[in-house]
C-alpha cells in the first residue's frame, strides 16, 4: 500500500514539475524590444546640479532642430536666444544667436528658398510669440533677422515646420492667437487657405506643428480667455494630419491622454516597444504617448513611455521631441527633448533611450 502511494506521489510530482516548466516558458522575460522601459538623461540645464552641463541661456527651452550633421539648435524662449548643444553629451557650443520676441518653433532650412533680406538663404528659421519670423545664416553673425512680420495681425506663433513641396518650399507657422496655420512660400509670401478642420470645437488652436515625411502633423490645445496661452488638463487636445498643401488627411488623436500636446516625432525601428510609432508629447503633464498608424490610415493609442519602475515618464514643461541623425546631434535611435520646468522659468535639454 505504501509503495503504491509512493508511486502515485512520484507521478503527481512529475506532472506538477512539467506544468511549472511550461508556465515558466509561457512567462519568459520580455525582450528589450517588447519592454516599455525608457531612461531619461538630463544633458543641459540653466540650474547647476540638474544636468551634466549648465547654461544660463537655456530658459524655457522650446523649439529643437538641427541640420543633418549639425549640433542641436534650441529656441530659448525665456532669454531670446538660440543655443547649440552636441547630442552625445550636451557639450555647449560657442555660437549663441540672438532671436528676439520669445522664440518658440525652430527649423533647419534644407530648401533653396527663404533668402534673407540681407542676402543668402536662411540656414535656420525661428518663429516667435511676437508674431514675427526670424532667420539666420553665417553672414548675420550672431543675430537672426526679421524676414516676415505678422504682428499687425496679432499673430502669436507657438510652433514652426518646413517642407520642400512640389509647389516649392513651404514654411508653416502655428498662430495660436488667431487659431490658424500661416503658410509662407520660399519668398516669405503668404500662401492662403488650407489647414482647416471644421470638426474641431471652438476654443482650440494650432499649438505644435511638425513635418514628418510628406505630411504635416498639427497639435491643438485649448486657448485661455485671451487666446494667448494654452489651458492644461487631462483630455484637452487634438492631433490632425495634413498634406503639405494643407489638405486634411485625418484625425490622429483626440481627448484621451492628450494634455496640451506640442512635441511630435516618429520613432525609428530601434526605439524599443514603440518603434515605428508616432510620439506625441504633452506640455500639460509632461507625458509622451505613442500612436500606431494602422493599414487603414487611422491611428491607435498604444500607451505612454514608462521608466524602468513602470511609471509613466513625466518631464515638467515638456516641449520638443526630435530624434538624432547620427551626426553632432546624437545617435539616430536617441530621442532628444526640450522643456521649460517650473512654469517655464527654467530650461532643460535631455535625451531618452530604450532600456
Outline where the language-model segments fall.
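A general, composition-driven signal for non-globular sequence regions
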Residues: 2-5, 23, 36
